[in-house]
From Swiss-Prot:
The keyword Ribonucleoprotein does not apply. It comes from Nicotiana tabacum. This is Photosystem II reaction center protein L. The lineage of its organism: Eukaryota, Viridiplantae, Streptophyta, Embryophyta, Tracheophyta. HAMAP family: PSII_PsbL (MF_01317). It is found in: Plastid, Chloroplast thylakoid membrane.
Length: 38
């Protein structure tokens, strides 16, 4: 009955990967805006 632990870990992994993806998109947007404005 230890099936809840992998599920919770998968949810946390998906959440952290989602935050890293949003952070990467934000950084790329800032870099592209600086490149185009320059």
């Amino acid at each position: 009955m230890t099936q809840s632990n992998p599920n919770e870990q998968n949810v946390e992994l998906n959440r952290t990967s989602l935050y890293w993806g949003l952070l990467l998109i934000f950084v790329l947007a800032v870099l592209f805006s600086n490149y185009f404005f320059n």
